Every structure is written in structure tokens, then in C-alpha cells.
Amino acid sequence: PCCGSGGMFVQATKFIEAHGGNTKAVNVYGQESEPATYRLAKMNLAIRGISYHLGDKAVSTFSDDQHKDLKFDYIMANPPFNLKKYAEYGEFETDPRWKGYGVPPASNANYAWILHILNKLDVNHGIAGFLLANGALDDSDTLEIRKRLIENDKIEAIIVLPRNMFYSTDISVTLWILNNNKKGGPWHGRQLRNRTGEILFIDLRTWNSNIYEKKYVRLTETEKIG
């Protein structure tokens, strides 16, 4: 929904290649509101031979969804944190993407991103991962939306990441995982247990051994989680 220059798509493709997957079977869809960044994303993907669909123009995904009738198996996003002035379009109050959850605050787009992403997921097995500022976890103005997300069993995991993960800011952020199907069963060669009614919480803020290097979750640390 806010693909920027397409860096996430490039890295996702590299991940698929590294794990023996078929990148030709992957269709990439994205949208970007800034014209210069939109053009850069198209160039970035084209020179790497990645098949992409970024809509017909650079425009906000809230006011003009370029993939309006599509649902997706997987969604990744790193939306602008605490975006203001995103709700300046005529149908904001009655936007069908908010149905069943309530209208998100017009002064902060955090929960508008969440509800938009949830709306775009395949209803049977869609999974999303996206980053938000930590303040989204306890924002009093969005309490009812969070309550309904939990009641509808849409949240798979909340992972608070270490500080200094970004070059532009030293704040800690949260990785949200949404899942439309937390039931157990076979999945890409693995057998998943039933996680219905469960939410995994992980706080990684103490993993801060070197504040001068950008962080990667090391194998020993993933073993601690497992």
C-alpha cells in the first residue's frame, strides 16, 4: 500500500531465490503516492526483471486504491509512522474498509493502514506483516478498533523490535503480523498447530548489544524465541 522505491519487493525476491523458490511465479503489486518515488520503484523493479503492478499513477492508497478489486495472499508494508492529513477525501467517514471496526482517527493514519491492509488480504488465508510506531499499541483513540481486531482473531503476533533498526531514526518500532487463518494444518511443507485465540508477543528491545550497528536477529537469538 506504500511501496516506496520498491526495496521490500527486491529483498523479498532475493529471499525467494535464496530458498529455491520460483520468482517467476510471484506477482508484485504496490502503490506509492510520491511521483518521484513511484518512478524510482518502477525503474528499480524493471532493471531486476521483477514483474510488477504499481497502478496507473502515483496516488494515495486511501483516496484512490489502484488495486481496488484485488485481494492478496501476502502483504508487506513499512508505512510512514504517524502520518497526518491522509483523510482528506470525500468518502473517509463511510469508507467500506472501516466496516466492522470503526472509523480510524483522521489525525493519524496508523490504524487506517491496519484496516486497509486487513481489507486487502485474502479472506481465507491472507497474511500481512508491517511496521508501525510503538505508540500504535496503546493509543487510547483506537482502543475499540484494537478490541475488535482481537475479538475477530486477526492478530497473529506483535513483535517489538530493538532500537536503531533504521538509519533515519533510533526509535523502537513494532512488527505486526495479521493472519486471516490461524487454524492448524499443512502449509508450504510444514505442519502448523492451531493458534486460534492466541497472540504471540515478543519484546526485543533488550537485544541492543551494539547501538552503532544496524540490528539483525542472530541464530542464537531466534533459538531463544523458539
Regions found by a protein language model. Give the residues of each.
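S-adenosyl-L-methionine
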Residues: 33-70
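A conserved structural/catalytic subdomain of Rossmann-like adenosyl-cofactor enzymes
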Residues: 69-226
